Regions:
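Active-site core of metal-dependent hydrolases
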Residues: 174-277, 283-284
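Divalent metal-coordination and catalytic microenvironments
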Residues: 7, 25, 47, 58, ...
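Metal-associated gating/positioning segment near the N- to mid-region
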Residues: 45-108
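Hydrophobic faces of well-ordered beta-strands that scaffold small-molecule active sites
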Residues: 53-57, 90-92, 120-124, 149-155, ...
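Buried, small/hydrophobic-residue-enriched core segments of structured protein domains
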Residues: 96-107, 116-211, 225
Length: 353
């Protein structure tokens, strides 16, 4: 058990200065003043702020990259890097390289991170179609593997499989059915590239098939102006979009253009590669994205419009669109995924471990 005394809570909403009792990895009680008749570990929160742990829904936990040959493969992420960024939940996935990287490797890494105290889930698939899987099918992965929350796919990208409208509908239908059977809120996380068709296939699939728009969740939606305009239209229709941050606050200008901000999440694309290409298609430049970008982006947004308005993009919104019932908020009965801040510095990360 732990007792945090006299701490300002943003849950994300402002709860004021409270005491928080943690028991069995859960938030047992939040009250103005908590006194116990027996001694337990007590943390003095005076002058500090308590928030939910951040959720990063786009992390290449086994390492991404590879577009510039084997030398460009990124290393797997370390658990301490995640915790140092104030992140207590991650979604691991594959990217361009679904050939030398595997879903089995992803699953094993997720188990490692979970055992070290970070909630870790994964997506099956990669950029390619048909999807590479852990079991014999996308459906079996979602139904039988608790940690698998959906499928990854690339669209409108020169590295994608350039699937057809019917293939997209077929894949989405399979995810939908498996999601219902598993009792999950499974989704199709769609890596969006720079090609001019942008979200065209997604719009066509939604129009043609009776599949909930919530199943389609495009990411990297600020990649270019045309894509972002289509992403805004997508949110107006009730869809969820994810914006990749760079740690320099660029997401702010995009968020300010969106009406339905509850359907917007921000992620890092950590341990994935960023790359630019020459006219002949060869790699011009490549680098690896650090997970610390998420914390930096949160601090930037928090300093612009406060904890209450900044936190949801990194916590509550993410939990809601992914179907997490007990994380993403500082609330009685929720998991004790918490971060203690003093100004812009993390003082302590508390997880289930």
């Amino acid at each position: 058990m732990k007792l945090i005394k006299n701490i300002q809570i943003y849950a994300p909403e402002n709860l004021g200065v409270k005491d928080v009792l943690i028991s069995d990895s859960k938030i047992e009680k939040i009250d103005n003043h908590i006194e116990l008749s027996y001694p337990i570990e007590t943390i003095d929160g005076t002058g500090c702020i308590l928030t939910p742990g951040l959720i990063d829904r786009h992390v290449h936990i086994t390492g991404g990259g590879g577009e510039a040959g084997f030398i460009s493969r990124a290393r797997p992420i370390d658990v301490q890097e995640i915790l140092d960024a104030g992140i207590t939940t991650v979604i691991g996935l594959l990217g361009t390289d679904g050939y030398t990287r595997s879903t089995k490797e992803l699953f094993a890494k997720a188990k490692e991170l979970t055992q070290k105290g970070v909630h870790t889930y994964i997506l099956t698939g990669s950029y390619a179609y048909p999807s590479n899987t852990l079991t014999s099918s996308v459906e079996d992965d979602i139904v039988f593997i608790d940690s698998i929350l959906g499928v990854k796919l690339a669209l409108s990208d020169h590295r994608s499989s350039h699937i057809t409208e019917d293939e997209l509908i077929h894949l989405a239908s399979r995810i939908r059915t498996a999601s219902l059977i598993a009792g999950k809120q499974a989704n199709l996380t769609i890596h969006m590239g720079d090609e001019k068709q942008a979200l065209e296939l997604v719009f066509k699939a939604i129009e043609k098939a009776d599949i909930p728009i919530s199943l389609f969740q495009p990411t990297h939606c600020s990649r270019n102006p045309h894509l972002f305009e289509e992403a805004k239209r997508f949110t107006d229709m009730g869809g969820t979009i994810d914006i990749t941050c760079d740690g320099n606050g660029k997401t702010l200008s995009y968020i300010q253009q969106i009406q339905n901000t509850e359907k917007v999440t921000i992620s890092s694309d950590a341990q994935g590669s960023w790359s630019t290409y020459n006219e002949d298609g060869s790699v011009k430049e490549i680098g690896i994205t650090p997970i610390s970008n998420l914390k930096k982006e949160f601090i930037y947004l928090k300093n612009e419009f406060g904890y209450e308005n900044a936190l949801p993009f990194f916590t509550k919104n993410v939990a809601n669109v992914l179907g997490f019932k007990r994380i993403g908020q500082v609330k009685e009965g929720f998991d004790c995924d918490l971060v203690i801040w003093k100004e812009d510095q993390i003082q302590k990360v508390i997880t289930k471990k």
